Regions:
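Conserved catalytic-core segment of nucleotide-activated headgroup transferases in glycan assembly
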Residues: 8-74, 97
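CheY-like receiver
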Residues: 71, 131-135, 152, 169
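Short, polar loop motifs at secondary-structure junctions
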Residues: 1, 53-58, 109-114
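A charged, aromatic-enriched C-terminal amphipathic alpha-helix characteristic of glycosyltransferases
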Residues: 13, 139-177
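Helix-loop-beta element that forms the nucleotide-linked donor phosphate-binding surface
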Residues: 1-9
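A short helix->loop->beta-strand "cap" motif at the edges of active sites that frequently abuts
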Residues: 1-2, 103-105
Length: 178
């Protein structure tokens, strides 16, 4: 029998793209579970010109849907480093970068996660330090990537689109012999 993989829908409304960074002091936000957060070696990144806010279920800023939205709106971009060597990393969904794109923000990540690689035309997937430099030096390209990313999310991750995927799966499964 067939196997179906259906992504999570985005829960966020699409917001305007805003990217006018101060190259001397970027505002950035990270959000993720404490389990993800404790796997990150922040010391390997040059964050000397980055005012980073960290949101997780155990703090320092405690996660909640509304809080995350507010901090993303205050940021120039979203930093989402991951530990690519951790066994579970490869199986993560792409809800975190999708959320950022939906809110009109560029994502910088080092993720090699297959679901995140689907977004590589719209987010930075590679060296975090190089991604920060790229964003500062290429604001027009960043805006274009986020515009295209929002279109991709709109076409693939809205509740309406995901509902249609579930209906398709239901209809296929409904034809199987028990």
């Amino acid at each position: 029998k067939q196997v179906f993989v259906i992504p999570d829908p985005t829960e966020r409304e699409e917001e305007p793209i805003i990217f006018k960074p101060n190259p001397h002091r970027l505002n950035a936000v990270y959000y993720g579970s404490h389990g993800n957060l404790k796997q990150i070696d922040w010391g390997q990144y040059d964050l000397s010109k980055v005012n980073l806010k960290i949101i997780s279920n155990e703090g320092p800023i405690f996660w909640d849907f509304k809080i995350q939205g507010e901090f993303v709106r205050q940021s120039d971009l979203v930093l989402l480093p991951v530990n690519n060597d951790h066994d579970m990393t490869q199986y993560k969904g792409n809800n975190r970068p999708i959320d950022a794109l939906r809110q009109g923000r560029f994502v910088i990540t080092n993720a090699m996660i297959p679901s995140w690689q689907l977004l590589q035309n719209f987010i930075w997937c590679g060296d975090i330090n190089e991604g920060i430099k790229y964003a500062i030096n290429n604001p027009d390209e960043v805006i274009k990537k986020v515009e295209e990313g929002q279109k991709f999310v709109r076409n693939n991750y809205t509740p309406e689109k995901i509902t249609k995927e579930w209906e398709r799966v239901y209809n296929v499964c409904d034809t199987w012999d028990s």
